[in-house]
């Protein structure tokens, strides 16, 4: 089973991933971008602003995703693999491009391999504003609430278009309730 935890910054992905590591100690935990040796370099290039063009940046992330599928997902196809982000985030954050075109490119990069289960932690604009006010913000978070809510909406649209098993969870719920919902969704004891 290939599971992806998705959500905009401050949605609680890291918290839920920490809980999942305790709940499923034999699972393989990974992340996109940067889940492989090459991926770490590509991520640094993309996030470090080395690519001056948004198209070049997108292709760096596609290269990372292709490597991630080959190095992590395919060799562990009979295991539980839980990823912090996936193709969904890659498509959503490349918001200057059409979703359908990005899906085509990502299916090439992933050899048509998609997560079997996608969990999206959703925030309302009000909850996002509160969470952002409680921390120092990185460059993406500094783009503002409207930007992040737009990304979240693109995540939802992408998930629906990919037509994979998914669940949208209100990220303002209690941490324990979210964890229980995720565990039930994965239906793995």
UniProtKB/Swiss-Prot annotation:
CDD domains, per database record: TMPK
Pfam families in the cross-refs: Thymidylate_kin
InterPro entries linked: P-loop_NTPase, Thymidylate_kin-like_dom, Thymidylate_kinase
EC number in record: 2.7.4.9
Swiss-Prot/TrEMBL catalytic activity: dTMP + ATP = dTDP + ADP
Binding site for ATP: 7-14
One term of GO molecular function: ATP binding
Organism ancestry: Bacteria, Pseudomonadati, Campylobacterota, Epsilonproteobacteria, Campylobacterales
Organism: Aliarcobacter butzleri (strain RM4018) (Arcobacter butzleri)
The protein, known as: Thymidylate kinase
